[in-house]
Amino acid sequence: YARYKEQSVMTMTQGDLINLLFDEVINRLNKGLVSLEQNDYEGSNAHFKKAQAIVTHLSTTLDHQYEVSGGLASLYEYFNYQILQANIKKSPEPVEEVLPMITELKEAFSQADKQVRMGHPG
């Protein structure tokens, strides 16, 4: 199974990988919120830190030749700040604020990927 999973990741398009990363950020944030609700601070810490690591990866892999990269870098920085605040304060509000923004950004990337694929068949 591990070999299959590795192979499927290796054959993904850049758009597929970004989509997968956003899905994992959203998943980890939701799990972190559930852990917070259950006063499982160790669990919420682990989930929030993983989400931050993925957001940091998304930020460090931006292609800065495009104008939009600066705005995305600022957004990613804000997402990580809010996740950190939720983790430090043991409060769901900062994550609840950015979760819809992250979901919307994921959808925007997904739509852009579909348009690129339609414009470049094969």
Predicted regions span which residues?
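C-terminal-biased regions
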Residues: Y1-D23, N27-G122
